[in-house]
Amino acid sequence: MAKQKFERTKPHVNIGTIGHIDHGKTTLTAAITKVLHDAYPDLNPFTPFDQIDKAPEEKARGITISIAHVEYQTDTRHYAHVDCPGHADYIKNMITGAAQMDGAILVVSATDGPMPQTKEHVLLARQVGVPYIVVALNKADMVDDEEILELVELEVRELLSSYEFPGDDVPVVRVSALKALEGDKEWGAKLLELMAAVDESIPEPQRDIDRPFLMPIEDVFTITGRGTVVTGRVERGIVKVNETVEIVGIKPETTSTTVTGVEMFRKLLDEGRAGDNVGLLLRGIKREDVERGQVIVKPKSITPHTVFEARVYILNKDEGGRHTPFFKNYRPQFYFRTTDVTGVVTLPEGTEMVMPGDNTEMTVELIQPIAMEEGLRFAIREGGRTVGAGQVTKVLK
């Protein structure tokens, strides 16, 4: 094969392995790196199993999670792949979005079929917005009976359909991660087939820069003779000088204003883009008209809300969370982007209480409106200490 130099122009996609314990997620992750290393040695280092298995700890929204990150390239793409050692780590990662996934490889053992955690991961993927799934039917070398393989495949497709994924169309590839890792050529080829399916059916994500402008306000100050400046990190989109923007959230009404200047590191710019830390000079706005916790956005792109449904993970006491359960009408603070807002919790029908370490659905009513859309993530705090994390699954009011 001709030498290829690393092309930064390749599209970048974030994926991860999900599925039941011991169905082979970590083995598959290692095997993918091996097979791609063998196919494109200049592009891919091989990452052995034990290196992925002892995943380093990270913090996301005050929650500690073990996540292993590996990267590799196919012919057409560059991938960042996440794998979590424990079931709880998966749940925490998916809810906090510590490692965002543009798509997932659902690993199902052909010897067991879908198991309880298979279902839980698929449900979470649906709720937290993992948009695409490809199935690796693993340990296929251990099943001689073609009919059994077909039945398991059917079961997986039905499971995906029941959670509103396109079960009939999702690629299902029969693999043996262990055999591929051991260097078996035929099973290695099946993994290349799996990655071709990932290339093909997990589309490129829309880049932050292409989405409507949004910047959470971190600080507000006055520059004598020039006006009010708000600072923050642009979360998405682009803001240009002389554009009209809206200030949304916290206060009952949304305010419209014009950006008369964009500054970064004391220099004047024409625009601020996703990822930039900038100061925006706003026309006709008084210091007391804006506050931390509001967002500056492209007009009409987002609205303020107080009532929503969410999927949450509640820390256990070893993670620094609560020592006792909570009940309906629990009133913690919900930390959105840059600020805390108190909210009242309603639990789902039939749920009396939520124990530390649980993940659950809930409805929340905030005492102040927040610029909100489905998919927005938050932390749950009591007096500045994180006790949980969640994601808005549905805006109600």
From Swiss-Prot:
Residues 83-86 are annotated as: G3. The lineage of its organism: Bacteria, Bacillati, Actinomycetota, Actinomycetes, Frankiales. It is found in: Cytoplasm. Gene3D superfamilies: P-loop containing nucleotide triphosphate hydrolases, Translation factors. Residues 176-178 are annotated as: G5. Keywords: Cytoplasm, Elongation factor, GTP-binding, Hydrolase, Magnesium, Metal-binding, Nucleotide-binding, Protein biosynthesis. CDD domains: EF_Tu, EFTU_II, EFTU_III. This is Elongation factor Tu. Mg(2+) binds at residue 26. Pfam families: GTP_EFTU, GTP_EFTU_D2, GTP_EFTU_D3. It catalyses: GTP + H2O = GDP + phosphate + H(+). It comes from the Bacteria. It comes from Frankia casuarinae (strain DSM 45818 / CECT 9043 / HFP020203 / CcI3). Monomer. Residues 138-141 are annotated as: G4. Its main location: cytoplasm. Its EC number is 3.6.5.3. GO terms for molecular function: GTP binding; GTPase activity; translation elongation factor activity. The keyword Ion transport does not apply. GTP binds at residues 19-26, 83-87, 138-141.
